[in-house]
């Protein structure tokens, strides 16, 4: 019996050592692309671009305007027909120009009272007074569609 337990323990340790390691930065980097231009951002990078606040459902978020983020990435937001936000779990949300050019649409990296909640990830879209499906959490990529 002891021998079987020992073999199972060694097998379990071996399998756990062979498991792929998760990239520690996964989810802490935001990719912005239009298919030709691609730029990545950390929360510190976004803070440099300017800070605005927007409130949704009683929570005040801090972030950067989406159109400012596009301009920094070398993408002219006025030439886009749509924008797609992609979350780490594969969820996507699509926006038309009236939404993504709005002054209060932002990519949030914090709340006014501190960091984003753990279930929000490092970044999220905030489009005030819209349904939850247009405010994805765990944002990892923004695709600009010409």
Provide a role label for each language-model segment.
Residues 1-16:
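Sec-dependent bacterial lipoprotein signal peptides
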């Amino acid at each position: 019996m002891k021998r079987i337990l020992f073999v199972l323990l060694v097998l379990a340790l071996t399998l756990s050592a062979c498991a792929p390691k998760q990239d520690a930065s996964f989810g802490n980097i935001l990719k912005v692309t239009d298919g030709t231009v691609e730029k990545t951002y950390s929360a510190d990078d976004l803070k440099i671009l300017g800070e605005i606040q927007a409130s949704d459902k009683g929570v005040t978020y801090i972030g950067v305007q989406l159109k400012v983020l596009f301009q920094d990435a070398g993408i002219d937001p006025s030439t886009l027909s749509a924008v797609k936000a992609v979350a780490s779990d594969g969820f996507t949300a699509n926006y038309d120009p009236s939404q993504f050019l709005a002054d209060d649409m932002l990519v949030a990296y914090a709340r006014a009272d501190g960091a984003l909640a753990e279930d929000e990830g490092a970044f999220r879209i905030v489009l005030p007074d819209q349904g939850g499906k247009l405010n994805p959490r765990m944002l990892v990529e923004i695709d600009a569609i010409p």
